[in-house]
Every structure is written in structure tokens, then in C-alpha cells.
């Protein structure tokens, strides 16, 4: 925690930030890596440090604040575009936030920096597979997703 070094970043803080990354990316029609890269390590550390208070705000306000603060722009990627032949259900932004939070948590060593792990996970090629809701990757067990991350592919 950059503001209170004696207070550790919790899994709930990580989950909130991953959820907001997903929500912001969907709102802007961007891939989640775009949001992560625009924030960068310092901003991710800040967001993780203040997640305990940010979760009290309306999520739409957090999206608007991130959009302004980090100069985020709209794109043309629609993660929610699915093929009805394969699935009829789109996971919620909270569900996908939890998927990414578990993955980030699983690869972060004890006492490690969640911001570094967020940057690493979201830059991984497996994110394109997780974010393809026509596949089953997003609802695979966490240990399978971690193995895929470590192997660089599903």
C-alpha cells in the first residue's frame, strides 16, 4: 500500500481493481490490456491502495474518473459479441474481474507486487482466449488458467 505501508493490499482490493479494469474496457469497447497499459504500474499501485474506499463509489463514476484521469479513449472491440451457436450467456464484468483477480493472485509471490502481476497477466496471450466467451476458458478452474498462463497458452 503506497499510502499506508503497514496495510497490505487484500484480495478484495485486487478483485475491485480487476473488476474496474473489465468494466472500463467494456464501457470503452477496448481490450482490457489497453486500460491496464494506459494506467501503468504507478496508477495500478495507487488504485490498489485506494480500492478499499473506491468500492463505495458508483462504479460508473470510477469508470468516468479513470477515463478522464488516464485519457482513455473509445475503441471498437466488443468483448460481448458472441456466437449464439456456441453460447448464449455473457459473463458479467464482476465474474471476469474475479477470474482475473484469481489469476493475478495465483502468480503473485507472497509479499509480491500485485501491480506487476496485473501488468504481466493482462499482457499474456491467454487473455484473448479468456476474453473469447465462445470458448470455455473463462470458466475453467483457476488452476487450469494459472497453468495456461505459465505455459503461455491453453
Place the predicted regions along the sequence by residue.
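Intrinsically disordered, low-complexity and often Lys/Arg-enriched segments
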Residues: 1-4, 71, 153-154
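N-terminal interaction modules that seed assembly of large macromolecular complexes
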Residues: 4-66
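A structured, charge-rich N-terminal accessory region that forms the first stable segment of a protein
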Residues: 8-11, 86-99, 104-107, 112, ...
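Surface-exposed polar/charged interaction patches
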Residues: 27, 42, 69, 102, ...
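Short, surface-exposed acidic
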Residues: 29-37, 73-80, 110-115
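Substrate/cofactor-recognition hotspot
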Residues: 48, 57, 67, 74-76, ...
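Long, compositionally biased
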Residues: 53-92
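Glycine-rich, aromatic-bearing surface loops/beta-hairpins
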Residues: 120-154
